[in-house]
Regions:
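Beta1/beta-strand and adjacent pyrophosphate-binding region of the FAD-binding site
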Residues: 1-15, 32
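Conserved Rossmann-like nucleotide-cofactor binding loop
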Residues: 15, 39, 206
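Gly/Ala-rich phosphate-binding loop of Rossmann-like dinucleotide-binding domains
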Residues: 20, 24, 160
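Glycine-rich FAD pyrophosphate-binding loop
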Residues: 24-45
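Dinucleotide-binding Rossmann-like beta1-alpha1 core, especially the glycine-rich loop
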Residues: 49-127
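Helix-loop-beta segment of a Rossmann-like dinucleotide-binding subdomain
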Residues: 80-91, 105, 118, 125-164, ...
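Helical element adjacent to the flavin cofactor pocket in flavoenzyme catalytic cores
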Residues: 140-198, 202-209
Length: 211
């Protein structure tokens, strides 16, 4: 196990592996990830993993749009399947407030070059004949909506990060962290300590126990 790195990422779920992957894409090759158990063994394995490109937050919309386009690239880069399934998504509004919200999102979609547009009830019934559209006043259709396999995506990020020089240590719990006077850190594990410039705590609910 390495004893000195630029960055230590704590947590081997989808977020941690994504951070590790993107650090390597930015040229940070001397980076490691520590996972207390197996990759995806925390919250990731049972995530719904729905994918859609729009959110009320503009910044989150940009991230979601970027990520949706990244999955196929990840598969090509790593050979690891992401379980991409995109049958399309319908968004229904039964209130004036929700209709207004959806129309704002449709305007954002045009700005980002995304396919998200209003359809009639007849069109929606053809797309999803088992949905009850009674009382619905506005319907938006996102052809690229769907879901992915969260474990597959996580392992694709991990594979891509490894290809770019990162190292991943499974079954390596973090038992403590200490900051040095110069601002660097010591990450303590059961297998030894790592001296690092930066720590990214991506351990989710278990993060408080990482020091």
């Amino acid at each position: 196990m390495k004893t000195k790195t630029q960055v230590v990422v704590i947590g081997g779920g989808l977020i941690g592996c994504s951070i590790l992957y993107h650090l390597t894409k930015l040229g940070w090759s001397n980076v490691v990830l520590l996972e207390r158990d197996e990759l995806t063994s925390g919250s990731t394995w049972h995530a719904a993993a729905g994918i859609h490109g729009l959110h009320d937050s503009t910044n989150i919309s940009r991230i979601q749009h970027y990520t949706m386009n990244l999955y196929k690239q990840l598969e090509e880069e790593t050979g690891q399947g992401c379980g991409i399934f995109q049958p399309g998504s319908l968004y229904l509004a039964q209130t004036e407030e929700r209709e207004h919200q959806l129309k704002i999102q449709a305007a954002k979609a045009k700005l980002y070059g995304m396919n998200f547009h209003e359809v009639s009830i007849t069109e929606a019934e053809n797309l999803h004949p088992f949905v009850n559209f009674e009382g619905v006043r506005c319907i938006m259709w996102e052809p690229d909506g769907g879901n992915v396999d969260p474990s597959g995506v996580t392992n694709a990020y991990a594979a891509g990060a490894r290809q770019n020089g990162a190292e991943i240590y499974r079954f390596t719990p973090v038992i403590g962290t200490k900051q040095n006077r110069d601002g660097t850190w010591i990450v303590e594990t059961e297998k030894g300590n790592i001296h690092t410039n930066w720590i990214v705590n991506a351990a989710g609910p278990l993060g408080q126990g990482s020091g």
